[in-house]
Structure formats: structure tokens, C-alpha cells
């Protein structure tokens, strides 16, 4: 079955509406939607997001869901529950602390420093089919680190799914180089006059259209 990008990345209406109506553009790269997505969580919306991501992931026949703490856990858990799959999340440690596990160092924008992602190798069985789920795809550092650990464990990344994607950052291009199919429920193409534009969704900015 050939999967078309439109199915994988078409806007999810309940989410797109909330972003357009309530999203706060902080600067040319930061969109705050923490009052319903990743700080205070609208559980009804998150449940719907989980069902939608699980539906789009279904053709890839994933055997487990992988994410990183902390903001990746809510959408990953909602997806895992909807898909009836186990969930594994990478824990964050001080980079100077040795951890007997699969590890990668990444820069954390929220903490503004290096952190160490760690996963117990026994939770990523060799040969398993893994789907990465996270709240945002921006620079792609977290997703790439998770993918590297999956490959080190001898498993396969079958897809990477995100609630929100910032198209104007390099995350998608980096993941595409690995050949990983990408799912996103809202692709932010740019910010205009302090408002986000979502690909394939009617704009609230006069005279502007994206897709």
C-alpha cells in the first residue's frame, strides 16, 4: 500500500482550530500552546489526538511507541492507548552521570543546556518495529536521538508522528534523510502578523493562504 503525504499530514481540525484561535506567537520560531497541549492539558483534545495519530500510524504496523520525557509523554500515551501498544519513554539525566543504557546527548531548548536521553536497551527488543511520537517537530534533535538509539538496539523506526510540525525548521529534512515517514497533525508554515499559518487550513490572516 502506497501512503500519500496528504493522509499523513493533513490538518486535524480540532487541533488546527485551537492553534489558530488560541496559539500565542512569541517570536519568529516559538508558538505557545501550553495551555492545552504540553503544560495544562485538554484531556478531551489529547484523547482525540491519540486516536488520530493511532489511525495514521496503523498502516506501519508498529509494535511499540517511543517518546522522550516530559512533554512527549501525553501525546505518546494517548496514541499508545488508542493503538493498544506498549509505550517506552527516554528519561533525561545530567550528561555527566553515567547510565547503563542506550544514551544520546541533545541540547534542550527548555533547559538551555545539554541533557542525556537514556533508554534501557531491554525495552527496545532487536527486530522490533518502533513508532516515535512527540509533541513538536522543530529542529529534529530529539527525534533523531531517539531514532539513533532504536537503530543501535537493532530495531526499526517505522514512522515518526508529531502533534505540531514547524515546517520552517530543519527537523523534517533531517528525518527524511533517514527514510522515516513523517506524520503531523498541524504543519505550521510561518507566522504572519503574530498569527500562525497552518498548511492546508484556511488562514485567519486577510489575504494569506497556505495550501
Curated annotation (Swiss-Prot):
UniProt EC number: 2.4.2.22
Where is 5-phospho-alpha-D-ribose 1-diphosphate annotated to bind? 138-142
Give the matching SUPFAM superfamilies: PRTase-like
Q: Which compartment or compartments is the protein found in?
A: Cytoplasm
Single Gene Ontology BP annotation: XMP salvage
In the record, what terms sit under GO molecular function? xanthine phosphoribosyltransferase activity
Does Cytoplasm show up as a keyword for this record?
Answer: yes
- Pathway(s) the chain acts in: Purine metabolism; XMP biosynthesis via salvage pathway; XMP from xanthine: step 1/1
Q: Which reaction does it catalyse?
A: XMP + diphosphate = xanthine + 5-phospho-alpha-D-ribose 1-diphosphate
What keywords are assigned to this protein?
Cytoplasm, Glycosyltransferase, Purine salvage, Transferase
Where mainly located? cytoplasm
Which GO cellular component term is one of those annotated? cytoplasm
- Origin, by domain of life? Bacteria
Annotated xanthine binding sites: 31, 38, 166
Supply the InterPro entries for this chain: PRibTrfase_dom, PRTase-like, Pur/Pyrimidine_PRTase, Xanthine_PRibTrfase
What job does the chain carry out?
Converts the preformed base xanthine, a product of nucleic acid breakdown, to xanthosine 5'-monophosphate (XMP), so it can be reused for RNA or DNA synthesis.
Q: Which PANTHER family match?
A: HYPOXANTHINE/GUANINE PHOSPHORIBOSYLTRANSFERASE, XANTHINE PHOSPHORIBOSYLTRANSFERASE
State the family named in the UniProt similarity comment for this chain: Belongs to the purine/pyrimidine phosphoribosyltransferase family. Xpt subfamily.
The UniProt subunit note reads as follows:
Homodimer.
> What protein does this entry describe?
Xanthine phosphoribosyltransferase
Query: Could you tell me which species this protein originates from?
Result: Chloroflexus aurantiacus (strain ATCC 29366 / DSM 635 / J-10-fl)
Amino acid at each position: 500500500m502506497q501512503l500519500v503525504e496528504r493522509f499523513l499530514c493533513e490538518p486535524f481540525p480540532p487541533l488546527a482550530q485551537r492553534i489558530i484561535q488560541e496559539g500565542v506567537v512569541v517570536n519568529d520560531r516559538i508558538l505557545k500552546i501550553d495551555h492545552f497541549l504540553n503544560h495544562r492539558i485538554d484531556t478531551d483534545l489529547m484523547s482525540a489526538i491519540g486516536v488520530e495519530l493511532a489511525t495514521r500510524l496503523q498502516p506501519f504496523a508498529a509494535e511499540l511507541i517511543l517518546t522522550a520525557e516530559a512533554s512527549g509523554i501525553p501525546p505518546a500515551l494517548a496514541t499508545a492507548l488508542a493503538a493498544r501498544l506498549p509505550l517506552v519513554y527516554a528519561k533525561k539525566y545530567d550528561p555527566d552521570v553515567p547510565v547503563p543504557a542506550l544514551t544520546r546527548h541533545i541540547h534542550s531548548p527548555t533547559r538551555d543546556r545539554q541533557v542525556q536521553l537514556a533508554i534501557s536497551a531491554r525495552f527496545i527488543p532487536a527486530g522490533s518495529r518502533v513508532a516515535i511520537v512527540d509533541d513538536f517537530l522543530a529542529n529534529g534533535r530529539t527525534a533523531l536521538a531517539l531514532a539513533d538509539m532504536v537503530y543501535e538496539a537493532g530495531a526499526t523506526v517505522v514512522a515518526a508522528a508529531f502533534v505540531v510540525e514547524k515546517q520552517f525548521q530543519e527537523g523534517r529534512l533531517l528525518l527524511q534523510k533517514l527514510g522515516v515517514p513523517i506524520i503531523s497533525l498541524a504543519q505550521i508554515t510561518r507566522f504572519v502578523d503574530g498569527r500562525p499559518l497552518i498548511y492546508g487550513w484556511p488562514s485567519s490572516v486577510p489575504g494569506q493562504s497556505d495550501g
